[in-house]
A protein has these predicted regions:
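Residue-level signature of outer-membrane beta-barrel architecture
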Residues: 30-32, 74-76, 128-131, 167-169, ...
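Transmembrane beta-strand segments of Gram-negative outer membrane beta-barrel proteins
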Residues: 31-48, 79-87, 173
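Residues that define the transmembrane beta-barrel architecture of outer-membrane proteins
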Residues: 34, 62-68, 119-123, 157-161, ...
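Repeated loop/turn-to-beta-strand initiation elements of outer-membrane beta-barrel proteins
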Residues: 38, 79-83, 133-137, 172-176, ...
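Transmembrane beta-strand segments that form the barrel wall of outer-membrane beta-barrel proteins
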Residues: 42-46, 136-150, 175-179, 207, ...
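Outer membrane beta-barrel
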Residues: 72-104, 113-192, 209-213, 293-295
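Outer-membrane beta-barrel translocator/channel fold
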Residues: 93, 173-196, 246-322, 326, ...
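Outer-membrane beta-barrel "beta-signal"
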Residues: 207, 329, 370-376, 402-417
Length: 417
């Protein structure tokens, strides 16, 4: 595989599209169209964030917006080497906001005027090639990997430009490798050079694999390098143990080792991150406990436009500051057991301590989250998803801002074919 091709998806996409059209017109029996599918994902998102400290730059951030995401996924042309083409279109519309209420992450705003945009959008294409049980995708990507995870917590999902090869030739083994060159943030219409913080890089290379030894046990390893910024190793283990009496214990262990690379454009990177989650499950009940421990001189690094793959990634905070130790207690319940299918409840409390950030040497931050979600089960609004999210975030020793937050999210997916 030519690494230059992965780094230049914009140049390859027109050629791949022309190739796909030629292959399709030459083969009326091709599955390019018959195996295709399309859907529109609609999300209505309201956020009210009330800053609680007296010296806050804003008294509150409050925005309301409507998002549309259209996904078209083709099948593959016939033959040993199959070709396909996917398309992604995203549109965000402002329903309510203002310069003094900006900054929820729903809408982009002007750097000087601070005026939220009335709309923003993105169109992405992804060419794909399939050989046996291996697929190469080049173009617009939304990866879900430990070292590169796209963000989908606001109106529109973030995207990356690059190439991704996924192979499942061996039963139980999934191998991923690729290169990302640009990122489009969740509240942006433009692709920018990939980076971390204010530092930019030419590319992010990654490779790794996950192997399922059994339905109950899997092990993963990934490596990622953001050129001239940082290098990162990841090791993860997932295990589910039946305990009898309808109980099971799920263990999720993750370890990252992150160091600087080359010129270290983002400054010195030195971080070890061990995090774990243990969940006891019985019927509709799930009780979880986590522990996340960071060591080293820097915060845990992750790509702009992405999320950190950590167990204490919660509604508002990530708990990934330098030297931070954090724990979480969480409870989930599915009301289907009480004859109310579609209704679920989640509440959790997360506590982080010993933070080093700027002039703060022993900072603390806590967050309490509650989610209530209902999916309508029948009628004309069947499958409409309604979620209320409530957040209380507090910090100590001058670490950061305090806030109370409510989010109301309505989601619906319409299958076109």
């Amino acid at each position: 595989m030519n690494p230059v091709s992965i780094a230049s998806p914009k140049h390859l996409l027109p050629a791949m599209a022309s190739l796909g059209l030629g292959l399709f017109t030459c083969s009326v029996q091709a599955d390019f169209i018959s195996d295709s599918k399309a859907r529109i994902e609609m999300r209505n998102h309201y956020i009210n964030r009330d800053f609680r400290q007296a010296n806050a730059a804003q008294s509150k951030a409050e925005e309301w917006a409507q998002g549309f995401t259209a996904r078209i996924e083709s099948g593959y042309t016939e033959g040993t080497l199959g070709f396909g083409l996917d398309a992604l279109g995203e549109l965000g519309l402002k329903l309510d906001s203002s310069p003094d209420r900006r900054g929820t992450g729903l809408l982009p705003f002007g750097p000087n005027s601070h005026e939220p945009a009335d709309e923003f959008s993105e169109l992405g294409l992804t060419g794909k090639l399939r050989l046996s049980k291996s697929v190469l995708k080049i173009g617009t990507l939304q990866p879900l990997l430990p070292v590169a995870t796209y963000n989908d917590t606001r109106l529109l999902g973030s995207t990356f430009q690059g190439g991704l090869l996924t192979s499942q030739e061996i039963s139980g083994l999934t191998v991923n490798a690729g290169r990302l060159t640009e990122a489009n943030l969740r509240d942006s219409s433009s692709n920018d050079d990939i980076g971390y913080g204010a530092a930019r890089s030419d590319h992010f290379d990654f490779a790794g694999a996950s192997y399922a030894f059994s339905p109950q046990l899997s092990l993963s390893y990934y490596y990622g390098k953001l050129e001239q910024i940082y290098r990162q190793h990841y090791l993860g283990l997932l295990h589910t143990q039946p305990l009898g009496g309808g109980f099971s214990l799920r263990s999720d262990l993750r370890y990252f080792d992150s160091r600087g690379d080359g010129a270290e454009r983002a400054g010195r990177i030195d971080n070890r991150n061990f995090n774990s989650m243990f969940s006891l499950i019985k019927g509709p009940h799930k009780i979880s406990a986590t522990w996340q421990q960071l060591s080293g001189d820097s915060a845990f690094p992750f790509l702009n436009g992405g999320d950190p793959y950590v167990v204490n990634l919660v509604t508002y905070n990530t708990y990934t500051r330098a030297e931070e130790d954090s724990w979480q207690l969480r409870y989930d319940y599915d009301f289907a057991a009480m004859g109310l299918p579609g209704l679920t409840f989640m509440t959790r409390y997360t506590d982080g301590r010993h933070v080093k950030a700027g002039t703060v040497d022993n900072g603390r931050e806590t967050e309490r989250d509650t989610d209530i979600t209902y999916v309508i089960q029948s009628g004309p609004l069947k499958d409409l998803n309604i979620r209320w999210r409530n957040v209380t975030f507090r910090s100590g020793n001058g670490l950061t801002t305090d806030l109370d937050e409510n989010r109301l999210i309505l989601g619906y997916t319409l299958a076109l074919w």
